[in-house]
Amino acid sequence: MTIADFRRIALALPHATESAHMGHPDFRVNGKIFATLLPRDDEDWGMVNLKPEQQRQFVEAHPGVFEPVKGGWGRRGATQVRLRAVDKPTLRSALLTAWLNTAPKRLVEESGLAVAE
């Protein structure tokens, strides 16, 4: 996948907007960041805000695609996505999960995107 793919999928989520944080494009719902793009000279990455258990599941299911962000943010669930290695359904799932974690409960319910636990 590419930066353009990441952006397109993120912005397709309800009420998602693009902004910037620390010089990187980010994607927000209700003013809160759920994903960030991390373009680099050698390889492009994205970041999704997952819960620690969700992070563990993505990392275990897709080794070489997902990895925790270094430091405290990573321990809280911030997860890097190697864009060249991820497929569209997996990227969409990660972005949707991050959006569901971040969006207000009312918006999640209205969207019909909530997954039964």
Model-derived regions: residue spans:
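Charge-dense, helix-prone N-terminal extensions
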Residues: 1-117
